[in-house]
């Protein structure tokens, strides 16, 4: 069969497109999503984006009945939503069990009233299981956390809920470069995040509770 130059170019472009599509499909097939609530979503996002095998962590809201809630609505209370983070990871690199273990050891799962300086239901911990396998894994991780602590773990294992991503100003907050006004004065966003995290006592409490098992202290 004889191809003209134009036909050859078209054929090569088609092959490249099909190959790229196959790569994208494979990449998507090799990921799993786990949704957790661990207090301030900036902190949870920052922690898990440092884990090898985590493709992305997205700050948002889950667990409530209000569709497309705003940040102010959620923190004011009454929506039923938690500040939550969707962790998208490659299970060939980091396992679901490892993600769950790190989650429990990065929060205070004995506190039902919020997390650290942030109080109220929207800041409490939770895991949103999207499948029976995720639920079983979460229950196992919860039991192990309770055993390791020798204390009751109050983090609920909930079912699947719609997840609403927070607006762009809350995504990757921990590494933002713009200047923001804080109670500490004007600060570069990444520095404002560090000041907030330190003042809130997150790492101090987690280290006291979990000791050397805490994976993100000082992060």
Identify the role of each PLM range.
Residues 2-13:
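Bacterial N-terminal signal peptides that target proteins for export
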Residues 12-15, 31-32:
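Exposed boundary/loop context
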Residues 2-3, 25-219:
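Flexible coil/turn and secondary-structure edge motifs
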Residues 18-26:
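C-terminal segment of classical bacterial N-terminal signal peptides
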